[in-house]
């Protein structure tokens, strides 16, 4: 089905373009949400008549998104979750959790605006992309830790999943050279015991 886009849609096209999409995508998403019109002669003339107001509305939305981006962009948020010794979370931090964290800070972001390929399943510093508008995308940092103290240590650059952090063992002391004598003869008779 061919549709006329009423706003810029990422990976599809710019406002005013006539694009061919699958029927289900048009019927279930683009048309009901008012993001597109069916591409016929009547709708093309209607679009040209409303083009100026649509562009003004899009510009207004973009400027609002840019204001939020200026405040929110580059911020870091601490997420405290329970995790095992190796840093593996008992659960995960998903888009829903990111929305709740941002809402607690006073930002109104929808779950569909949070772009995460997979949920976060380990402690550490993680960058999360947020699409505020089709043309405005920012990145926030999530500091996932077991406690506020660990989050502070991670912020300073300490790795909490290393052997030293977990067991108090210096990883440099675990080199194979320290365990084996390269000069030793491998044909000792008491090896058969």
Swiss-Prot record:
One Gene Ontology cellular component: ribonucleoprotein complex
One GO-annotated biological process of the protein: translation
Biased composition (Acidic residues): 179-193
Domain of life: Bacteria
Annotated Pfam families: Ribosomal_L9_C, Ribosomal_L9_N
Molecular function per GO: rRNA binding; structural constituent of ribosome
Keyword rRNA-binding: yes
Record region (Disordered): 174-193
Residue spans crossing the bilayer: none
SUPFAM superfamilies attached to this UniProt entry: L9 N-domain-like, Ribosomal protein L9 C-domain
Keywords of the record: Ribonucleoprotein, Ribosomal protein, RNA-binding, rRNA-binding
Alphabetical list of InterPro entries matching this protein: Ribosomal_bL9 (IPR000244), Ribosomal_bL9/RNase_H1_N (IPR009027), Ribosomal_bL9_bac/chp (IPR020594), Ribosomal_bL9_C (IPR020069), Ribosomal_bL9_C_sf (IPR036791), Ribosomal_bL9_N (IPR020070), Ribosomal_bL9_N_sf (IPR036935)
PANTHER family per the UniProt record, alphabetical: 50S RIBOSOMAL PROTEIN L9
Family assignment from sequence similarity: Belongs to the bacterial ribosomal protein bL9 family.
Role: Binds to the 23S rRNA.
Name listed for the protein in its UniProt record: Large ribosomal subunit protein bL9
Record organism: Rhizobium rhizogenes (strain K84 / ATCC BAA-868)
Lineage: Bacteria, Pseudomonadati, Pseudomonadota, Alphaproteobacteria, Hyphomicrobiales
């Amino acid at each position: 089905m061919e549709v006329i886009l009423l706003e810029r849609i990422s990976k599809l096209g710019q406002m005013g373009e006539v694009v061919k999409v699958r029927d289900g995508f048009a019927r279930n998403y683009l048309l009901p949400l008012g993001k597109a019109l069916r591409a016929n002669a009547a709708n093309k003339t209607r679009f040209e008549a409303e083009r100026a107001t649509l562009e003004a509305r899009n510009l207004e939305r973009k400027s609002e998104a840019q204001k939020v981006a200026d405040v929110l962009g580059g911020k870091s948020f601490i997420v405290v979750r329970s995790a095992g010794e190796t840093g593996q979370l008992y659960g995960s931090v998903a888009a829903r959790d990111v929305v709740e964290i941002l809402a607690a800070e006073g930002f109104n972001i929808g779950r569909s605006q949070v772009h995460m390929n997979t949920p976060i399943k380990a402690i550490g510093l993680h960058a999360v992309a947020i699409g505020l508008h089709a043309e405005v995308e920012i990145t926030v940092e999530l500091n996932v830790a077991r406690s506020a103290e660990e989050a502070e240590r991670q912020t300073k650059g300490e790795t909490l999943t290393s052997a030293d952090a977990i067991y108090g063992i210096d990883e440099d002391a675990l080199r194979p050279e320290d365990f084996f004598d390269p000069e030793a003869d491998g044909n000792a008779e008491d090896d058969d015991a």
